Each structure stands twice: as C-alpha cells, then as structure tokens.
Regions:
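Structural signal for conserved beta-strand scaffold positions within catalytic alpha/beta enzyme cores
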Residues: 27, 67, 120-122, 247
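Residue-level signal for inorganic ion chemistry
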Residues: 14, 57, 92, 148, ...
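N-terminal Rossmann-like or analogous alpha/beta NTP/dinucleotide-binding catalytic cores
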Residues: 36-119
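Phosphate/ribose-recognition catalytic cores of enzymes acting on nucleotide-derived substrates
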Residues: 166-276
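N-terminal catalytic cores of NTP/NDP-binding nucleotidyl/phosphoryl-transfer enzymes
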Residues: 1-55
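A non-catalytic, amphipathic alpha-helix used as a structural packing/dimerization or gating element
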Residues: 19, 52, 147-154, 262-273
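Glycine-rich, Lys/Arg-enriched anion-binding loops that position phosphate/diphosphate groups
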Residues: 116-208
C-alpha cells in the first residue's frame, strides 16, 4: 500500500476540507450527495457542481479524485465491503464525522481495528464555531457573503451562460451581460452584488428586475454591468460557453421602483459603492 487518501464529500471544499486534503495524494468522494438517495426530501442544495469540486480539490495539490456514485446498492453494502476502495492506500485522512457503509457503521475506529493508519483531522473554525457546508449555505441564504467567503477561503462562485437581454439596461445607460445560472445556487437573496468576472470587478443584479414590468425576467437571471473602461470583459464573456462569476459582496436587496428615473438614480448609487 502507498499514498495518502482524503475521504469525505467535500461540498464547497471549504477551509475545513482543505485541512483534510492537505498532503493527500488522492481524494475519495461521491458524485452525488448521499441524501439524494437516502432522504431526497432533505437533500441540500450543493455549493458547487461536481466538476467544480474536482477542480478545486486538485488545486489543493491532490493528484487523483476517486468519485463514486452514491446508490442504494452502495448504501446497503456493509462497511467491510467499502474498505475495498481504501485498501490500496497507506494512510487515510478524514473528518471526525466521516462515516461509511450500511447504517453508517464504518468510521475511523472501525478502520483502525482492521489495521489501517487513520488520521482524524480536527475541524477548522470561524468566529469560534465549526466551519461546515451547512453553515456556509445558511450564510449565503442571508446574503452574508463576508462570512461565507471567509469560511470557503475564496469567493463563492456560480457558472452561467449568456441569454438574450431586452436592452433596458443599455437604454438606461448601464449595458449588461445577462446570464442564466447553470448550477442551482443556494437560496441567495435577490439583490445587487459586487462580483468578479475573469478577475474584473463588476456589479450584478440577481433576480427578476421587477421594475421592468412586462420586460421583467420570468426566472431569476444575473445581469452584470462592467465599468465603462473594461470593454474587454464583455468580449471575454462573449467568447465563453460558460462564465464563472465570483460573488464578493452583497450591496442591497432587489426592489421594485416607482419609475425608471428612480431606478436609474439607485443604479448610479450602487455603482459608486462598487467601483469607487
């Protein structure tokens, strides 16, 4: 046996996960959340797609990601059977709450009793409390990007693809690139955000644009406006099939204005907060 494997679901690949992944040669994870099979009614909205998770895990220095499909068949296997996925490694790193096998009976002590070298990595903390994917989802739901990003160790991001706009932003003097979000984000509040696209600062509205009346979006859309001296960002987006949008800061909640002039004044104020 050789090499170190880090085991866990790693949704978000937050600072706590990074402690587990540190120094690992491989990561053992699932493509889908166990709740999607065992308790679909309670399945959490994931912080990232599997492709994003794999990319971030590898950016931590992990060479190989072993991704299993979580199925009812796998869930019904005894923990002794699950050991087959770990037997080629000399050491296993995991969090204190990592479990595997039927009835979640497999854990670090189960492996140690069978001769495995297991290191249980202590939780990372933020503001005196354990960092978890659940806690990050809760922060995003409140629009608390400062806390969410601090726990992630990077800006939370989504993937989007361009959709046709209605020209209203341009008519107001604030042209936008309009994106449909490809991965289902947590319940991020509708509102105005400071974002980064290709490393360029921008301002974005996530929501329905209710002031537009009949021109409002039927489903939530991300409308992104760049400062006037960054036309290259528009070109970069136009050339991309998928665009990564990093959320840096929550500015305000979305609301319906009495008229376009009132909306235009508010957009000007929002832009000053982001760009000045």
């Amino acid at each position: 046996m050789s090499g170190v494997v880090a085991a866990g679901f790693f949704d978000g690949v937050h600072l706590g996960h990074r402690k587990i992944l540190e120094g690992a040669d491989a990561a053992l994870t699932f493509k889908n959340h166990p709740s999607s099979v065992l308790h679909p009614e309670a399945e959490p909205t994931l912080l990232m797609t599997f492709a994003e998770k794999e990319e971030v895990i590898k950016s931590c220095g992990v060479k190989k990601v072993i991704a299993l499909d979580f199925t009812r068949e796998l869930a019904s296997e005894p923990p002794e059977k699950f050991i087959e996925f770990l037997s080629s490694f000399s050491k296993i790193r995991c969090g204190a709450d990592w479990r595997f096998g039927k009835g979640a009976k497999g854990n670090a002590e189960f492996l140690r009793a069978r001769g495995f070298d297991v290191e249980v990595v202590q939780y990372a903390e933020f503001q005196g409390e354990r960092i978890s994917s659940t806690r990050i989802r809760s922060a995003l739901k409140k629009g608390d990007l400062e806390s969410a990003n601090a726990m992630l160790g990077r800006n939370w991001s989504v993937l989007g693809e361009i959709v046709a706009g209605k020209g209203v932003g341009r008519a107001l003097g604030y042209p936008t690139v309009n994106l449909k979000i490809l991965n289902t984000p947590p319940e991020l509040p509708s509102g105005v955000y400071e974002v980064l696209v290709f490393g360029v600062k921008a301002i974005a509205n996530w929501g329905y644009a209710p002031t537009m009346g009949d021109a409002a979006w039927v489903e939530k859309t991300l409308e992104i406006h760049f400062k006037g001296d960054t036309p290259k960002a528009f070109d970069d987006i136009a050339k991309s099939n998928q665009v990564k949008i990093e959320f840096a800061r929550f500015i305000r909640q979305e609301r319906k204005f009495a008229n376009f002039e009132e909306l235009k004044r508010q957009i000007k104020e929002d832009c000053e907060k982001v760009f000045n």
